[in-house]
């Protein structure tokens, strides 16, 4: 984007040099790639008035001109331009002057006639041929308006200017316009931005009487509007407008087309102007193209369209390729009198695909691709109406013909001063922060310590709190952020943190139990994103995933661990024991960063012990997996409890939730037989723990106790109970009545079958008693044992 300083001053006034402005803009995030000075290498360039022109006596292609350059007498200049003529105001390089390329102007004789200066073309003063009006491509430049001879020609041409070239990143589409840049500059210098005039004197005639607009697919075209201007006069644009277009890299054509391009650069809103009489209908229908449909664009090329393309039609025939290029038969020509001005919002993806496929890149398509500001769509059309009325003698019809919805002009985001200060290291007051947002043109609402920032649609790069924090840092000044030393809760001298130590300890426990550590992808398929999830929350999906298998961020580590086990088993490695410590992700509200939680998961399948010498095998089972989990809890000095549960994807009768301090922190269970079969796995057991929750409870030290000086006692008890009663319920009853001498319990046998009623099972439990202060007696233990048995009988158990 090329930003003219002379043009920028129309919206914002600052007392600073262009070089300082460019430096400041670069420091705040928009790189100024180049600074173009149109006065560089130019000296003694003035406006001249050609008083007379005579043919050169000795050269057919040369003319001898008498030119008034504001001095006492006219000077004689020999000129070879085919379009030079008496009565013209022209650009003159005086004797002693300089032009780009090191050209020095001297007195000379051309075929015997003296020449005291040079009548210049735009190319000769450094303007690229690509941007010069076609009428001056092969001759000198002629002013379309009367000038004062002898005045500075660069000032008369509005080229006494410096232009900044922005190297924009895709997120800063707002700076693809003069107004967007003016907002940025106003914020940097804490000044006000003045918007241009948009109000026209309207006729009583309504555009609704001459035009209708219909959108067939609002997903691709959310909004389309049109205004009508009658009786325009096609002529060259004013010099100032032509100069601004040239400095922005656009060739001036005529006042109507130039106004369209001017407003595009001013607001960043692409417009299209149709010859109303050439449309051939009072209907404008916006639809997707028919497969194989053809149209000829403004570059005289016939295009074959696809259904993915969006076209503007007169109800039958395409008159424009939406957002990319107009059609040839409705273009503005010299005889055009009545204009229809289009202002619309088109789907960025559709515009990108169409422009890429047809190799049609334009100023309009590049802006539609990045997304445009809804707040400027109608305002830009109104601005074009005002300019057509002012510079093309147009008569503006009242009312706007539209279809669809513009959408929200603002996006509210809540933030606090504390959040900003903690993130950046500032100490700004709430008023300071609100002032910065107001400098940026963002309205704010304050409710206690919460600042609600109303972000305008032109700033599509601001969607979350962190974006607002960046804006505060940019405008306040990155260089002004105070240097501070990092603050730590606890400083360690080159040693592991408590969490690092405990994580390493857990890994050693699991590796010692025969499990291998795995590291899997954080991305899973959308179907697997919520599988085994302990929190039923919204998933985080990629907008453009590389494959369907990696389309969402995981909420569990198990889907990929199951894949890893299946992969190994398919390659004859049938005994698989893996664990992983990794992050899972849960979405928050729109504009909020997701929660990132560290989990610990494991999977075991096949044989746990293979003794080839004796031929004995121990197959992985629930209790083996539970033993691994219990070993983790012991190492972290935690106490888990288990509660029967039903979890999708796990065996309904062999699954339990893992509780810590009465809160669910994980689960353990056998993989559902159907899921196991789908992955060619035999009986497979998995567990998953919220590792962050464990770390939050686990203390960073181990409590040591003396070795008991007195012997303990063990009693076994066999209970016949209903098969649906979990052992955990029985153990809970035992511990509730065991007093302070019952140290632990162990289920060592479960039996169902012969000699038991149907629906019953026998559970054998060992109870270990110990008193650390004195030797236990049989009488004391028996008394406690009797209380326990009575409680179990009351629970429905039969003592065997």
UniProtKB/Swiss-Prot annotation:
Question: What does the record list as coiled-coil region(s)?
Answer: none
- SMART domains given in the database record: B3_4, B5, FDX-ACB
The record's Gene Ontology biological-process terms are:
phenylalanyl-tRNA aminoacylation
Q: Name one GO cellular component term.
A: phenylalanine-tRNA ligase complex
Q: Which GO terms describe its molecular function?
A: ATP binding; catalytic activity, acting on a protein; magnesium ion binding; phenylalanine-tRNA ligase activity; transferase activity; tRNA binding
Q: What does this protein's record comment on cofactor binding?
A: Binds 2 magnesium ions per tetramer.
Residues noted as binding Mg(2+) in the record, renumbered to the chain: 461, 467, 470-471
Cofactor(s) recorded for this entry are: Mg(2+)
What does the record give as the reaction this protein catalyses? tRNA(Phe) + L-phenylalanine + ATP = L-phenylalanyl-tRNA(Phe) + AMP + diphosphate + H(+)
State which Enzyme Commission number(s) the record gives.
Answer: 6.1.1.20
Q: Which UniProt keywords apply?
A: Aminoacyl-tRNA synthetase, ATP-binding, Cytoplasm, Ligase, Magnesium, Metal-binding, Nucleotide-binding, Protein biosynthesis, RNA-binding, tRNA-binding
Disulphide linkage map: none
Instruction: Kindly indicate whether the keyword Chloroplast belongs to this entry.
Output: no
The residues covered by the B5 domain are: 408-483
**Top-level class of the enzyme under EC nomenclature:** ligase
What is the name of this protein? Answer: Phenylalanine--tRNA ligase beta subunit
């Amino acid at each position: 984007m090329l930003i003219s300083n002379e043009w920028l001053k129309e919206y914002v006034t600052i007392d600073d040099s262009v070089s300082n402005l460019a430096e400041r803009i670069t420091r705040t995030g928009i790189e100024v790639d180049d600074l173009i000075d149109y006065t560089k290498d130019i000296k003694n360039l003035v406006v001249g008035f050609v008083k007379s022109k005579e043919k050169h006596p000795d050269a057919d292609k040369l003319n001898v001109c008498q030119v008034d350059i504001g001095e006492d007498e006219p000077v004689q200049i020999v000129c070879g331009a085919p379009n030079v003529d008496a009565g013209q105001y022209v650009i003159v390089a005086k004797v002693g002057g300089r032009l780009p390329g090191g050209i020095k102007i001297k007195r000379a004789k051309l075929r015997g006639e003296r020449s005291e200066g040079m009548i210049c073309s735009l190319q000769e003063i450094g303007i690229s041929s690509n941007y010069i009006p076609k009428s001056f491509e092969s001759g000198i430049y002629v002013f379309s308006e009367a000038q004062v001879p002898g005045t500075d020609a660069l000032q008369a041409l509005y080229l006494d200017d410096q232009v900044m070239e922005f190297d924009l990143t895709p997120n800063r589409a707002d700076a693809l316009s003069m107004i967007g840049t003016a907002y940025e500059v106003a914020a940097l210098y804490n000044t006000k931005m003045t918007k241009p005039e948009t109000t026209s004197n309207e006729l009583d005639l309504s555009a609704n009487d001459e035009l209708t607009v219909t959108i067939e697919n609002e997903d691709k075209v959310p909004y389309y509007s049109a205004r009508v201007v009658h009786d325009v006069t096609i002529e060259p644009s004013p010099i100032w407008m032509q100069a601004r277009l040239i400095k922005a890299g656009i060739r001036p054509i005529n006042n109507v087309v130039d106004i369209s391009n001017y407003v595009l650069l001013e607001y960043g809103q692409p417009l299209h102007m149709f010859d109303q009489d050439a449309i051939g209908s009072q209907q404008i229908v916006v639809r997707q193209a028919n497969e194989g449909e053809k149209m000829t664009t403004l570059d005289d090329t016939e295009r074959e369209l696809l259904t993915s393309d969006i076209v503007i039609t007169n109800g039958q025939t395409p008159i424009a390729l939406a957002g990319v290029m107009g059609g040839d038969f409705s273009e503005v020509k010299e005889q055009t009198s009545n204009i229809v001005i289009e202002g619309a919002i088109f789907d960025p993806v559709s515009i990108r695909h169409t422009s890429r496929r047809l190799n049609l890149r334009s100023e309009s398509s590049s802006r539609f691709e990045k997304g445009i500001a809804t707040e400027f769509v109608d305002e830009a059309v109104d601005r074009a109406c005002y300019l057509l009325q002012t510079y093309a003698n147009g008569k503006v019809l009242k009312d706007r013909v539209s279809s669809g919805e513009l959408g929200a002009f603002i996006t509210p985001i809540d933030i606090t001063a504390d959040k900003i200060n903690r993130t950046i290291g500032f100490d700004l007051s709430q008023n300071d922060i609100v002032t910065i947002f107001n400098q940026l043109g963002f309205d704010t609402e304050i409710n206690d310590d919460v600042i609600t920032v109303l972000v305008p649609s032109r700033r599509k790069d601001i969607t979350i709190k962190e974006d607002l924090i960046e804006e505060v840092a940019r405008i306040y000044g990155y260089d002004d952020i105070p240097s501070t030393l990092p603050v730590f809760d606890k400083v360690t001298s080159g040693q592991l943190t408590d969490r690092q130590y405990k994580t390493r300890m857990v890994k050693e426990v699991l590796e010692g139990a025969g499990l291998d550590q795995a590291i899997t992808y954080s991305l899973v398929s959308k179907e697997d994103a919520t599988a085994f999830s302990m929190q039923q929350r919204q998933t985080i999906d990629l907008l453009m995933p590389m494959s369907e298998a990696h389309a969402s961020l995981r909420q569990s580590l198990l889907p990929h661990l199951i894949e890893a086990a299946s992969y190994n088993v398919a390659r004859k490695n049938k005994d698989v024991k893996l664990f992983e410590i990794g992050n899972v992700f849960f979405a928050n509200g729109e504009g909020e960063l997701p929660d990132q939680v560290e989990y610990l998961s494991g999977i075991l399948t096949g044989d746990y012990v293979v003794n080839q010498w004796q031929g004995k095998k121990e197959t992985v089972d629930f209790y083996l997996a539970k033993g691994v989990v219990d070993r983790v809890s012991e190492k972290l000095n935690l106490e888990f409890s288990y509660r029967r549960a039903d979890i999708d994807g796990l065996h309904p009768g062999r699954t339990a939730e893992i509780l810590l301090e009465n809160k669910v922190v994980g689960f353990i269970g056998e993989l559902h037989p159907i899921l196991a079969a789908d992955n060619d796995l035999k009986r497979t057991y998995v567990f998953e723990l919220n590792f962050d929750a464990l770390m939050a409870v686990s203390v960073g030290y181990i409590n040591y106790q003396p070795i008991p000086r007195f012997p303990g006692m063990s009693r076994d008890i066999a209970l016949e109970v209903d098969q649906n009663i979990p052992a955990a319920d029985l153990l809970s009853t035992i511990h509730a009545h065991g007093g302070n001498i019952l140290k632990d319990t162990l289920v060592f046998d479960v039996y169902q079958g012969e000699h038991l009623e149907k629906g019953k099972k026998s559970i054998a439990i060992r109870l270990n008693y110990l008193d650390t202060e004195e030797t236990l007696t049989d009488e004391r233990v028996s008394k406690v044992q009797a209380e326990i048995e009575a409680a179990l009988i009351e629970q429905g158990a039969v003592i065997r």
